Amino acid sequence: MRQIAPAVYKLRKTIKNLLRPEAHYLLAVSGGADSLALAHACAALAAQGWGSYSVCHVEHGLRGEEALRDMQAVQRACEAWGLPCFTEHVQAASYAAQNRLSTEDAARRLRYAALRRIAAQHLL
């Protein structure tokens, strides 16, 4: 964690200028370094009373065990940082085939739908 601390500090400062402290935000977190840094920065902001945050991780059914490890890493990080974490499993490849979309477009549409569904279900 010490290696990303300067990046997290800088990100926190930027986020404070963009977001409202009384609002709740749902973060889409892939498990990559960038999205985990964002979640970490937002957890630090929440601890300071600057907004509240939840995380959504969507597993697209494309990368097998590697994707499941990413999902577990996101869940562990959220637990450590005190962020509620919601996960969804979707089948991007079959959705792409059924709707004549590229896999990338299908994954994006399914991810956005998952974010809308989670926000609505949990009144975020």
Task: Tell where the protein language model's regions lie, with residue ranges.
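Core alpha/beta nucleotide-donor-binding catalytic domains of modification enzymes
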Residues: R2-L124
